[in-house]
Amino acid sequence: LFKQKNGRILQALYNGEDAWTGDRSRDDLYFCWNVNFRNGNDLAQTDRIFRASGRMRDKWDEVHWSDGTTYGQRTLARSYNKR
């Protein structure tokens, strides 16, 4: 993951830095999108990687939508790569 062209950015994001857009939510999405792109859209694995990263925070498991969806669930769904 970190040996790609954008590997330095992804490493910084994994470490919890806001290294791409400066917006935590956008950086979360960008990070998840890149992980999904490389793992064949294994959302469970992406969730585990995110939780192990410095990006993890309480917001990930908080409900943010009226349908009961958490921030993490919505971010993972939005990061799914259509091929």
Where are these regions (language model features)?
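Modules that initiate DNA replication and primer synthesis
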Residues: 1-83
